[in-house]
Each structure stands twice: as C-alpha cells, then as structure tokens.
Amino acid sequence: MCGSTALADKLHVQDKSVSQEAFTIQQCQACGFQFTNPRPDAASIGKYYESDAYVSHNSGAQGLINQTYKVARYFTVRRKVALITKLNGGQPGHLLDYGCGTGHFLAGAKKAGWQVTGLEPSARARQDAARRVGQAIQQPEVLATLPAGSFDVVTLWHVLEHVHTLNETLDQLIRALRPGGKLLIAVPNVTSFDAQHYHLDWAAYDVPRHLYHFSPATMRELLARHGLIISQKLPMPLDAYYVSMLSERHRPAERQSGMVGVLQAGYQSNRYAAQHDGQYSSVLYVAERAA
C-alpha cells in the first residue's frame, strides 16, 4: 500500500473452503498492511470461488450456516437501505453497488425508490441478481465507463478485499461519486477479537479469495492516500457470530466447541470492540472526499 519493499511473512493460512491449499499472508513493516502474497492472478482466481457453499454467489446454497446467513441478510438489507437513505439526506438517490452478488441489497434499495446500478464479476451471480432486481447487471469493467459524479452513494459490502486492482478501482469509484457523495466500504477487521481468538482458523482470512486483510488503521491510511476521510466507522455486530460459526467449522474436530463456543466468541468479540475503539469483527467505513 505504501510502496515499501520491507515485507515479512505474518501467517501461513489454509484455504479450508475450496482448495485446501496453503497461502502466505505478508505484512508491510512500514505501514502494517497485511495481504495475501503470492496470490492467484485475476485470470486464475475464479476456480477458488467454485463452491456451491459460496453463498454470496449462490442464492440456493443450503446448510445451517448458509440458512443463518440468509436470515441475517433479510434484516441487514433493511438496515443498509435505511442507512444509505439517511446518509443521502433522507431521500433515495442514485446508488452503485460494486460487487453486488446475487442482488438482494440492490433489490431492497430499488424497492425503496433508489435508482440502482450493480456490477458483479460472477456470471452466475449476475444472472441471479438480474432476475431479482429486474434489470441488467454489468461486469466490473463497466466501472471505468460510468459518467463521473453520477452516484450519490457507492457501496462495497465485503468486496474490496477481493479486488485485484485495488488503487485503480478505488480511484474509479471515487470518480463515480458526486461531490458530497458517500463511499461505504465493509470489510473484515484483522485486529478484531475473533481474529485473534481463532488465529489460523479465522474464517475471514478466506485465502486466497481475500487478497487484503484490513485493520481500521490501514483502511484509514489507504483512504487518505486517495483523498478520502472516514466520517463514520460503524459496527457490524452480527458478523462476529457468523464468522465465529464458520471459524468453528474450520477448527480440528477435537477443538470445536459447537454453538456454545460460537455464541461466546461472538459476544466476546463485540464486547471487546465496544471497549477498544470499535475493533469489531467487521467494520463499515463511511468515507467522503476530504475538504
């Protein structure tokens, strides 16, 4: 992120969702930024998403964890739509959802009166989203062709950590924002309690799909380098329980503690965050151009 070449291996983490391969997470010794390195390039990473359990690309995914995700999504979509409407002065406007998945948030926003645009790399998810939203969903490459200043709000819900062209994409997203518009970025927090508690089994490392592993400090630095300030840092408390549920499944059988362990870890993570400057399992950053 900062351009330093002083890098050190931080962790060696296994992809327990798809390939079972091991990947290295490195940390910059200058700015503290953590990232998966080496990682598959954009042309070859698609195979690491080829799982019916990857719920953000597959509305038909089954099982307890995926059903829990869908129940939580029903409630969080409402909260997300209410939030963007509040940030836009209480009125619907023009929304760009970058990495819109199967389109549930877009559909909720459209129902609330927003003019919506969705971009999504997965062909399967695009088709699902198009049916759900009732309009075409484009590939991410379209971002560079969108008119400058055409959106009141741009959202990335657990997407930025997947983007190969990090700086270029951020610049294009900022360009698409109108003056005074808001950029919302939700990402896992590598300095959360549950990240430390589950360590190598922490599901939100999600290598190699997650290329970057942000903390509030490194997110602040990244956005500042693009001329943005963080106006709000909002908790995503349900993520602590969902990530803990996935992480318990990643543990060896003899170390799993079932739903009791999930509830304890989720509660402890949120309690820790409330006492330590909002270090939640996932954080939603509301950013805008610096004055």
Task: Explain the meaning of each model-derived region.
Residues M1-G149, V153-W157, L166-Q172, P235-L238, ...:
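Conserved N-terminal segment of class I S-adenosyl-L-methionine
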Residues V116, L183-L184:
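A short hydrophobic/small-residue beta-strand
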